[in-house]
Amino acid sequence: MSLAPGPRNLITDVPGLRVGNAQDLVIKSGVTVMLADAPFTAGVHIMGGAPGTRETDLLAPDKTVEAVDALVLSGGSAFGLDAASGVADALRVMGRGFAVGDIRVPIVPGAILFDLLNGGSKDWAENPYKNLGKQALEKAQQDFSIGSE
């Protein structure tokens, strides 16, 4: 049996998956969001000396939550973890999330990378990553840019 790439040769060749990117040229950083038409199963393997993650513990098979609403990958080191908050806020407005009574709690695990010394301006008054997360979610589609633009 040989495997052949899908029509796009992208992760979005999997039916129902979409990816969105957002970047800020001033801070030289960005966010990528992956979501599906419905909550999906995800897993994680965390490595490195100083990993930065959000809600990744709930991806273990013994946890209550069995699916996630989106995954977020962000620059910005610890500041970038806030990108998942922007995604969660937008998903909640869309009615997505884990049902807790009448409330919907979007499950949005995320991970960051350290890019604070990349030459971009980090002298912001307000953390830009929450908005970048929301922008990336809004841009999610089957065809998306790969890498830095």
Regions found by a protein language model. Name each.
Residues 1-149:
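Alpha/propeptide regions of enzymes that mature by internal proteolysis
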